[in-house]
Amino acid sequence: MTGTTGERQTAGRPLSYIEFIALAAALMSLNALAIDIMLPGLQQIGADLGVENENHRQYVISAYFAGMAAALLPFGPASDRFGRRAPMLFGLGIYVLAGIAAAFSQSFEMMLALRFLQGVGAASTRVIAVSMVRDRFGGRQMAEMMSLIFMVFMVIPVVAPSVGQIMLVFGDWRLIFIAMGAIGLVITVWALFRMPETLRPEDRRPFTLASIGSAFAMVLTNRLSLLYTLASTATLGALFSFINSAQQVYVGIYGLGVMFPILF
């Protein structure tokens, strides 16, 4: 990054290498946090919101995935057109507000709608955090940076279910969503004041259907890109299927209760 675009938009000293890794990992971890921390509370959510069919409790996770999937496409081109910071902060705002609002859901339908919105907001961090790394680093250095970020990121799926289970000891499932929103707010403020704009004005692209279609055609006609996409789709599909049914299988079928976060 040459340094004129983003750093003038943030206060204080420039972002260090270590802080950039930590912030990028924190942004990406919000996605895993929104899924894993609330898994122990699915049973309570279903009971409190009147879900009669226990299979329908999993819709709380499915709605989140649906929102994220729907928003991944528009956030990418939007960040190429308007820069990285504005779309990312917009998405973070949706994530925080939807998470806190979900804590006050009075019906299962309201919960699903808010989880869909939270997924929409989380899509911004998933797409844009990677783009910000690509803006600042290239080649081997980018690969090393992404490896470090994912090392930090992988801590969240390990500890989040246990944190959620501990919260259920001191409160109910609503406390989990309030905590989720609070953590998102802290990371949003951190990004607002410390994360610079990484996309230079001369590198921005028009946000048109033609440009989006051209980019899609480039990916779909490249054999290597298509194979990587299919492999990633198969892997993530299996992972999301496991996450979507894990709580019901571990708790409902095997009766593991509070042991679920440890075994998960």
Where are these regions (language model features)?
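Helix-loop-helix hairpin linking two adjacent transmembrane segments in secondary transporters
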Residues: 110, 139-140, 144-195
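Extracytoplasmic gate region of multi-pass secondary transporters
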Residues: 224-264
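Residue-level signature of mid-helix packing/kink "hotspots" within the transmembrane helices
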Residues: 36, 65-73, 157-158
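Extracellular/periplasmic helix-loop-helix junction of adjacent transmembrane segments
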Residues: 41-70
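Extracytoplasmic
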Residues: 19-51, 242-247
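Conserved MFS/SLC helix-loop-helix module at the cytosolic interface between two early adjacent transmembrane helices
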Residues: 69-109
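Juxtamembrane intracellular "pre-TM" segments in multi-pass secondary transporters
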Residues: 6-13, 198-228
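Cytoplasmic helix-loop-helix junction between adjacent transmembrane helices
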Residues: 114-153
